[in-house]
Regions:
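Short, surface-exposed acidic
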Residues: 105-115
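Juxtamembrane non-transmembrane "cap" segments at the membrane-aqueous interface
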Residues: 97-98
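Short beta-strand-alpha-helix junction that forms the catalytic/metal-binding core
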Residues: 40, 66-87
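Short cysteine-rich loop/turn motifs with clustered Cys
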Residues: 23-56, 80
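A boundary/linker detector
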Residues: 1-28, 33, 47-48, 113-149
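Short Cys/His-rich "knuckle" micro-motifs
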Residues: 52-60, 90-94
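Cys/His-coordinated zinc-binding microdomains
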Residues: 46-47, 61, 84
Length: 149
């Protein structure tokens, strides 16, 4: 009898799971924000593009500077690539995003977000796996809504 070399699937590290969770949530936010034809509007400049073509899930509070808000839906909204990658640092996209956030959630909530930005938030591998599973289910529902399944 031949012995097979079956590679055991290595468990993902918390960092790998966090990255997957971020990507999954950003996709979900874009899908939820899309109209029935699959188009999203950039919260910073107003450009309209298909949810999966030139639109990203932009973070109001940068994901690298806040573990507290990085995986919260209220912190992520559709942004075109230009605004998300370049405009937040070199243009006025950040100011326009702030105005959007204040109109959407109110100044008090935005101020609380900014105050909480440096708070630590400890998540474990199981937390990430649960979030990913939940968000993937919601993604399926949104894709069905758009007929993109």
């Amino acid at each position: 009898m031949k012995q097979r070399n079956v590679k055991k699937k290595k468990a993902k590290t918390p960092q790998q799971l966090r990255k997957e969770a971020l990507q999954t949530l950003q996709k979900l936010v874009r899908l939820k924000s899309a109209d029935d034809q699959g188009y999203c509007t950039c919260v910073s400049c107003g450009v309209v593009k298909r949810w999966n073509e030139g639109i990203q899930g932009g973070h109001f509070i940068p994901k690298g500077s806040s573990s507290f808000w990085s995986l919260e839906e209220e912190n992520i909204h559709p942004q075109c690539i230009s605004c998300n990658q370049f405009g937040m640092k070199h243009g006025d996209a950040a100011q326009r995003y702030t105005i959007y956030m204040q109109e959407m959630y109110g100044k008090n909530f935005v101020n609380q977000m900014l105050a909480d930005a440096k708070k630590p938030k400890k998540l474990y591998s199981a937390d990430y796996r649960d979030m990913i599973a939940d968000w993937k289910e919601q993604i399926k529902e949104q894709l069905n809504r758009l007929g993109d399944n």
